[in-house]
Amino acid sequence: MDSITVKELAHALSAEAVGNLDISITGAAEPQDAQAGLLAVATSEPFVARLGEGKAKVALLANGVDWRSLNLEAAIFVDRPRYALAGLTLKLDNNWRQGKAFIHPSAVIDPTSQIASGARIGAFSYIGAGVVLGKNAWLGTHVTLGNGSFVGDDPTLLDGVKIGQNVIIGQRFVAQPGVVIGADGFSYVSKEVAALENVRGTLGDRGDALPQPYHRIHSLGAVQIGDDVELGANSCVDRGTIRDTIIGSGCKVDNLAQIGHNVIIGDNCLICAQVGIAGSSTLGDNVVLGGQTGVSDNLFVGSNVITGGATKVLANVPAGRVMLGYPAMKMETQLDIYKNLRRLPALVKEFARLKSENQKKD
């Protein structure tokens, strides 16, 4: 990347800078790896302690750190270090949305599509009939926009992203490689009542249903996605059966997540890696689902709910709950159960001892 001075970087971060503000910075590193010309990111005490192992002249520090005692020539101070990383990494990212506006000659673009100014469209991409693509779009290679889809301004669609027909996406959308939006939902039915339906209704009894083939229920709905949404690599969002699947504004979805048909997700939710949300479930606003959380179908998860990793949600969750475990329960309850389970071997031994003593007395 082109170099940036300490003064310029501090201004970009709305941060305070001290020392030699004319030092040039070409990148960032952890303190022990930082060489001259790199900014040492030392925003917590363990990292500050390792500054002496590297050769950094400039460091990003939390407010209040004595920078002069660290043999630095300059420092940038921030109130909330992790938040500062968002601005810092954006400023120093050499690969983000690089390249001038152009359309690669191998791209296939339907003449009825509307592509606004500033678009960069990579090799072997396909834009279907009636597509509307907003300003300053950045498309990698092998990106597909299905017929009738709409994508707002400033989208970033990395290599291999597939957007199905009639999908509607808001402003500043980011899709990491391999994202698929608008594939058919997982929806099948048998002619007669199947064993799995009996099990679902009775919680265990298969009944006398005979094996039989399954028939596809086609997905006639689409997908709607709000503004400032990001989807991680190889995540999938299925189209609705009749109505649309909906993801609210500000949601961030990690890699390898599955969002089923008819799901509704509110605003500003965090969906971590390997989460699965089954069909027709609804999430409120500001929900956080830890990695490998599973949400069963046709459930409601209220606003501000947080689930720990690998939680399995099998029933509705009221707003504001913090959940953990399989099945999901209040985190403090689950932790109490876990602690008591660890005590079981000792309790069994104690019970056996007491039983033996009583038998001897008899």
Predicted segment positions?
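Terminal amphipathic alpha-helical/low-complexity segments used for targeting or macromolecular assembly
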Residues: 1-106, 167, 172, 178-179, ...
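Structural signal for interior beta-strand "rungs" in well-ordered beta-sheet cores
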Residues: 41, 102-194, 202-330
